[in-house]
């Protein structure tokens, strides 16, 4: 099987095209600056992953920006920091500002010449629209967790795309 045998490429965005780890760590800085313990980047990302996956399981229909607001609140509780709901919501909306990897735009422009491009993402439509503006490509299909009503790795996500 050769790559030229395919007409459509489907992939995730966050971690593939958008540097979600750097975006998260930067957006969490107002919170982590208040923490008395010394947190490494890995500490932050591991705690975030735990709270994110738990929240996704409990509330699979929640929009990603709302889910991230809950994650922010849970991180603050874990780290013993007081935060306002407005701070939590600001973090939830930060996805739109997360940076693209340096080579993403060029790679997508090249791939678009040869393939239909499809996105399957755990984010919501609002968050993805901000990221898509950074990527500057027309995707032939965009399937968000908001559209599907579940989060990956649920089979529902992949069935919806197909």
What are these regions (language model features)?
Residues 20-21, 27, 129-131, 154:
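Short glycine-/acidic-enriched loop or helix-start segments at secondary-structure transitions
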């Amino acid at each position: 099987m050769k790559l030229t045998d395919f007409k459509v490429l489907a992939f995730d965005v966050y971690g593939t095209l958008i540097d979600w780890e750097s975006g998260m760590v930067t957006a969490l800085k107002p919170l982590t600056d208040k923490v008395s313990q010394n947190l490494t980047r890995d500490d932050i990302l591991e705690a975030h992953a735990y709270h994110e996956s738990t929240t996704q399981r409990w509330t699979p229909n929640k929009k990603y920006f709302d889910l991230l607001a809950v994650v922010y609140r849970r991180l603050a509780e874990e780290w013993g920091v007081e935060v306002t709901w407005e701070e939590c919501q600001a973090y939830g909306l930060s996805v739109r500002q997360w940076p693209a990897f340096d080579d993403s735009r060029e790679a997508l422009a090249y791939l678009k010449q040869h393939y239909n491009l499809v996105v399957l993402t755990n984010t919501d439509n609002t968050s993805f629209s901000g990221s898509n503006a950074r990527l500057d490509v027309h995707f032939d299909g965009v399937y968000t967790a908001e559209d599907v009503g579940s989060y990956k790795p649920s089979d529902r996500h992949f069935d919806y795309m197909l």
